[in-house]
Amino acid sequence: MKAFGLKLGRAVLVLSLGVASAGAGETAVRRDIPYLPDEALVSASAYQRERCRLDVRVPVGVTGFPTVVWFHGGGLTGGSKHFIRIDEGIAQVAANYRLLQKDGSVTGDDCIDDATAAVAWTLRNVAKFGGDPKKVYVSGMSAGGYLTMMVGMDPSRLGKYGFRPTDLAGLAPISGQATKHFNVRAFAGDVDPQYLPKIDRLAPLAYCSKDLPPIVSICGEPPWEWPCRAEENRLLIASCVALGHEKAWFVSCPYADHGRALTAGVPYVELFVQGRLPDSLRLGARR
């Protein structure tokens, strides 16, 4: 690793530079960037300031590249930001977010709001790193997949920052809960059975529409995947298609359980970003 200065207008960002795999070129990494807007930082708690940070990895020597904003899993109660193994020509923004607290100090809305702020930061700043703001994708695993859908499907979220869901190039949730997340429910005092599906304003299924960015929902395969997870995601995609969405894919990774859905699903995220996802996986496509 070595220090690298990248001049962006009047600013100089000091990045950590590493060499990627052969033929892939070099990437520059900058870590722990605060992503909350200045007005939010004024009233932010110490915990929020600690968690609301992101890492950026970009290809060196090229411009106009696509970017994936990646949200980690962990049931909204654990986990930490990390990069995924995709083509080095695709930039990544790996973001932390606040985790649910039993005392109610952090709610499901707070988790989603943090994720939204990270995506809005990326839309506003990726051009400074050489990326194309029209090629910003959002993806995440499990709880991160849930956040991906909530940020990219509920128009009120990005609307707070002057953006629309269609300002995103695409959504690629991996094994995200399409109904209301079970821990969002539990931490709010809901004692109903975990697998009783609930659809309200905190459920991605409530926002199915034709007016969404391209979306691929990636899951493991029943019966190995988390109960109901693949089925509810297929319903989400099928509902979007029935409402007129023309670029919606559903992928069930053969024999993959919930954990293996990550390693099996990331290659599909890469294909999606590169525009190489097989049309045969698109629901509603003619066979």
Kindly give the residue locations of the regions a language model identified.
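C-terminal catalytic histidine-bearing segment of alpha/beta-hydrolase fold enzymes
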Residues: 218, 234, 241-287
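Catalytic nucleophile-loop/oxyanion-hole region of alpha/beta-hydrolase
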Residues: 42-45, 80, 95-133
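N-terminal cap/lid segment of alpha/beta-hydrolase-fold proteins
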Residues: 25-61
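Primarily recognizes the serine-hydrolase "nucleophile elbow" in alpha/beta-hydrolase
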Residues: 124-185
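Mobile cap/lid helix-loop segments that gate and shape the active-site cleft of serine hydrolases
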Residues: 37-38, 173-207
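Active-site-adjacent alpha-helix of alpha/beta-hydrolase-fold enzymes
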Residues: 188-197, 219-249
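Short, proline-enriched alpha-helix->beta-strand connector loops that line the catalytic pocket
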Residues: 165-169, 209-215, 243-246
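Short substrate-entry loop that stabilizes the transition state in hydrolases
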Residues: 63-65, 71-104, 226
